Structure formats: structure tokens, C-alpha cells
Amino acid sequence: MALLITLAACAGPGPEMPGRRPPALADLPPMKTFVTHRVTPPQRSNAAIAQDFLDLAFQMESGRSLPYMTRFEGPITVRVTGPAPASLEPDLAALLARLRREAGIGIHRVAADAPASVTIEFLPRSQLQRLVPQAACFVAPRVSSWEDFRQSRRSGEVDWTTLPVRQWVAIFIPGDVSPQEVRDCLHEELAQAIGPLNDLYRLPDSVFNDDNFHTVLTGFDMLILRAYYAPELHNGTTRDEATRVLPQLLARLNPRGERIGGSDLMSPTPRAWIDAIEAALGPGTAPSQRVAAARSAVEIARTQGWRDTRLAFSLFAFGRLALGQNNGETSLAAFLEAGQIYAAHPVTRVQSAHVAMHIAAFALSAGQPDTAVLIIDDHLDDVQNGENAALLASMLLMKAEALDMLGWTKEAAAIRRDALGWARYGFGSENEVRERMAEIAWLNPARTD
């Protein structure tokens, strides 16, 4: 805490210095990828998970209610069409294997020209966003191609609330983004294509949350999907019917959740807070309006009496946006408070790491490289376990700058090279890698090259 108090006293925008010029892409190390997945079971009671399941399965992100559950019956087939990037093959194979192993879902890939339950179509990002400007990627029912979607997008055909059973759906993903962005889209959109359609900001350990902290399906997500395809539930199950079935169903699937005591049920999230967060983080809003919306989200969270992830996320969003307005002291104060909330719970270690990266950046720009190294080292394992290559690369590049400042140039060079391997997966293009490396180099107040 003393380190952070000292850091707060030094808060201010980082110096704008010319950055280190990264090597050409041909000189970069090979792309690094995550080869193993650490399964972490849910850390909440089954009573809380049952409430989460109901809110995920019987409501849309817009707030519209769904009258009953829909799901696929029988084996689920997946095909890929369009110009898919090379990174898709191992990432999709790993995801399908996890769904079979952890969620017990019979799902497998078929040829591109075969009929399939789920079509994953790749297309240029510009083409996708011409029709759906706010979407990085998305899933639609009753269509099997982009052309189908174009023709049906203003009709009831792509309305999930009118769907009696899932027979075929299509996922649309840009093929010209980083490997990590492709993988993240795969996880979130395939989970919603076959499972619940809603996202809940209150969930601390889930991809079914628009805060985007978790980018690969978690143990909680796999439990939700396993329950979604349990024999006790079926197409047409209503919310009341699911409410009666879930206690015994979850006791069977997740016996450890029966042993977790305490009241971990969370209050509903008011629409005003969601609207404020979406205004703060969505496109097409002026910077000053974004800051005001984030401040409003913080105020609503405090009024609600929250001390959970929703207040922390409000503060995190406000901290990032205030930083963009060159308000370093306000930004750091928001990050520090968000970090304290996230650090209080083991289940939010991934969120803590995101906050820590920003605090470490303040330490670096304040000329405190030893503090930056301590902060980063405390979170690297959590970032690795969360499989976020972009965040991992950023933190390692920051650590390399800090070590340079401390005179450990040989160690800094080795860590920087390791970071660039992760950057190739997390950021993709040479230009993106260059930009990120330069941004972090600018944090070093001593750098003049």
C-alpha cells in the first residue's frame, strides 16, 4: 500500500517520448500460443448459479424475456466457410474438444460443403460492420450464410424470441483481425449459438459478460452449458419449470456448489447502469460524453450500495476514459479503488491483472521501475491462466522497459523477445505490434531513442 500511495502522489500523464522501433515482422520470434487450459471450477453456491442460469437462459441482452428455452437436439455439427485465418484450426479444435470433455456436448466439425447445425463464416471486418456497425462478431438464428443474413436481417427470421427449436445458426467473424480476436469470438459466439443468449455484468468468472475480461470459456461457463444440455431440460422448458428442476440438477452436476455457504446472490442490475456503461464504452460517443457516462455508472453503483464487480468495472471504465482526457490523478484513484475490490476475491484475479497493468504503467512513467516489476510479477500467472496473449505481451513489454531502467538490459532483451511472441498472437499484424511496443516505450521517462 505504501508503494501505491507514493505512486498516487506522482500521478500524471506519461511523457510523450519517441518509442523504440520494433523489429520487422520477419525478425520477430515465432508466434506463441496457449497449449493447455487450466480448468477452474465455479467458486459460488449452486443457489447463486441457479439464478445466473435463469437470467442467462430466459432473457436477451436487450432485456426482452424469452418465453422458453431453445437448444439443439442430437449431435451438433459445425462447418467453417469463407477465408479463415490459419490460427483457426488449432483454436477451433481445442474449443470443440473442451465442449465435449467439460460440457458433455456432442459437437464435431464437418466439411465446409456439408449441412451443419452451426456455420462459422469468415468475412472482412469492413463488410461485417457495414451491416452491423457495433459488432465485433455475432450469431444469428435460422441462417447459414452471410447472404442469408443480408436478406433476412430485417425480418422475424432472425428473431431469437420466435425460435421454437434451434436447427441451424450462423456465426460471423472477421478474418482480418488478430488470432486472439478470432479465438475470443469463437468462444463467446459458439457458446451463445448453442447455449444461453444473455450476458450479465454481475458475473465475475464468465465469458457471458460484456466486460470482456474473460476471453475463453471458464469452468462456470462449461457448467452452465452442461446444465443447458442436461436431460432434465428440453426445448420448450419455461423459466418456472427450470426453477423447479435446477436445484437437483446442479447438485448432481456440481456437488461442490452445495458445500459453499453464505449468501452470494447479487441484486439485479438496473437498466440505467447498463445504459451508462454502454454509452461510456460504445462507439459513436464524444470523449467528454463517455467520461460523463462512466462517472454516472460509478455514481449509480455507489447508490446501489455495490461493492462487487459492477462497481469495480465502473471504476475501471472511468479510469481508462479519464486517462484519455489527461486526468492522471483521477484515473489512478479509480484504478486503485477498482484494484482493491477485485483483489478482495480470488475469482476476480483476471480482472485484477487488467487493472494492475494500468497501475504498473503509472509506476513506470513516474520513474518507479521496481514498483512496476513487482506489480507485473504478481499478476503474470493469472494472465497466463486467463489465456490473454495481448495482456500478457503488454505486461511483459512493460516489465522489459522497467528492467532497462534498472540496468538489467540482458534480462530485458530476453523478456522483450518473449513478449513479442505473445504479441504476434494477441495483436496480429506487424503494425499493431509496432504501435503497442512504441506506446509502452513512451512510458519510460528516460528513453530518448
Question: What are these model-predicted stretches?
Answer:
Residues G12-G19, S62-G63, S144-E181, D199-T309, ...:
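Metalloprotease/metallohydrolase-associated module, dominated by Zn2+-dependent proteases
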Residues T6-A9:
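C-terminal motif of bacterial Sec signal peptides marking the signal peptidase cleavage site
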Residues W306, P346-V347, E387, F427:
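Structural signature of alpha-solenoid helical repeat scaffolds
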Residues T269, G282-V298, Q325-E337, A366-D378, ...:
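Helix-turn-helix repeat elements of alpha-solenoid scaffolds
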Residues E89-A193, L197-L203, A312:
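Metzincin-family zinc-dependent endopeptidase catalytic domain
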